[in-house]
Amino acid sequence: LAKITDYQSLIDNVQDYLNRDDLTSVVPTWMGIVETELSRRLRDRRMISRATATLDNQYIKPPSTLVALRNIQLNTDPPSTLTQITPDVMDDKRASSNAFGRPAFYSHLGQQIEVYPSPDTGHTLEIAYYRTIPAITADAGQTTNWLIEYHPDAYLYGCLKQAGPYLGDQSITTTFNTYFEQAVQQIIQHDTDTKFSGRTPQTAITRIG
């Protein structure tokens, strides 16, 4: 078996494990399922991303890759962190006083982030969030990501457990789901350990809106 380092080597290893050479077209679908599941389950420090936007009304659309918010702040001097409140509390605040000023609270509901008070002028808003795991593809520049670089076993076992229903063999799913769950728990534990042994890596800030 070849070392798993990228998109193609993952496909090759999945086929080798299953002793098949006709799965090239379906393995990428399994990769996508693994990426989607782990995007929901993991809150790894390598998933942290940052984005900025000009906040000039009470609503702003979050980044399309967002799976969970971590922090929202106004890039004032000094920076001002917004406090998260529930949509119900936001509604109560609006009902009592639809004020304008420097935003101090936010609520996340569906595809919108709402702030309160409504901004009295344009502010630069910075959002720190957990983003989806970038999909790996055959396209140049997209054949690897942090998950396959640091945790290729999770990708492999996640793909292999998807092979069971496709091949009509439940034992494949049972076996590799066990390995997959072990790998996921090790990723979570590794991230927990590293949070207390060093700083969270710096992330590039993208512009939204």
Language-model features and meaning:
Residues 1-209:
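Glycine-enriched, solvent-exposed interface loops adjoining structured elements
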